[in-house]
Amino acid sequence: MIVVKVLLFSEGKNTFSRSGVGQALNHQVEALGANNVEFTLNPDEDYDIVHINTLGIKSWRVLKKAKKKKKPVIYHTHTTYEDFKGSVKGSNQLAPIIRFWAKKSYNGADYLISPTEYTKNLITEKYLNKEKEIRVISNGVNIEKIKKDEELKKNFLKKHKINKPLIITAGLPFERKGIKDFVKIVERCSDYQFLWFGSSSIKSMLPKKIQKIIENPPKNLIFPGYVEKEELIGAFGAAKLFLFMTYEENEGIVVLEALSAKLPLVVRDIPVYENWLQDGINCFKARNNDEFYKKMVSIVNEKVENINEIIENGYKIAKERDLKKIGAKYKEYYEYILENKNI
């Protein structure tokens, strides 16, 4: 057995701790810990292999330094041009710069990890100058931490004074995440209560039209901002379903959390969810607002005959991606790389 010490590197850890990339780093720490893999977050410490999560000058320097020391470099392909568009102010103008850095960084690495087959194919077709080994490993989820809890559910309902059927979603409130479509659904359903969980600290970074939605939402929509995991678990227990209207993802950790909580999941029918998420088998898929509305109403009104079977199948998807299993996959990949080291 090869003894491995891994440098997990993400720049701007504090700034982006509540983003998907920030959550992914937390999951890596947990996954490696569960598999007794030694790691460090400090690039000044010694290590055998570096696993980089972010794009940027500091990340590039870490890559170059590792190369100089003949240490293998893995880049995690969390960030793409496609999923950066429609996020913060000026993101569409900045997206080509993100693409430049993504190409430079991913081509500079020795090995890559993508969270889904969709992202692997996207990186292969649009980002790489030559063939490179890419391992598909989910960002994972801790299924033990996302179990429904009756007490947390009661506390949540009391805190937010909810007495209508509850629909929830989560994620940074970006246009790419489908926030404008979400609001249209909210306006159509005055007899339902909606909550969008996600960091409100970035509000000033959002386009004016999105800021206005957050500042003046419909009466039946609440933006609680970022909440601790206990409150989110309370929401999972209280909600009728999880509505995820995003237009572009590389996986979506919140999707895995909803499945772990055995909450009916309605997602947009986009390429990243092909094959592993199946409409009417382990989730519900919609292509437009009308379809989202119809599927949502049928779930709330308990019109789906095999709903329990669909929920259990969804839970199996999350179980396959439990962090302990994900950590074992990281460990196997690290050992494989060190055994075949040819840097």
Model features per residue range: what roles?
Residues V141, A170, Q193-K209:
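Glycosyltransferase donor-sugar binding loop
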Residues K161-K177, V183-E187, L195:
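Conserved donor-binding/catalytic core segment of Leloir-type glycosyltransferases
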Residues P207-E230:
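Nucleotide-activated donor-binding/catalytic signature segment of Leloir-type glycosyltransferases, i.e.
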Residues Y247:
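Aromatic "clamp/platform" in nucleotide-sugar-dependent glycosyltransferases that forms part
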Residues Y226-V227, G234-A239:
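Short alpha-helical donor nucleotide-sugar binding micro-motif in glycosyltransferases
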Residues D279-D290, S298-V304:
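Conserved acidic donor-binding segment of nucleotide-sugar-dependent glycosyltransferases
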Residues P264-V267:
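Short hydrophobic beta-strand element within catalytic cores of glycosyltransferases
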Residues L94-L112:
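Membrane-proximal helix-turn-helix segments that form the acceptor-binding/catalytic region
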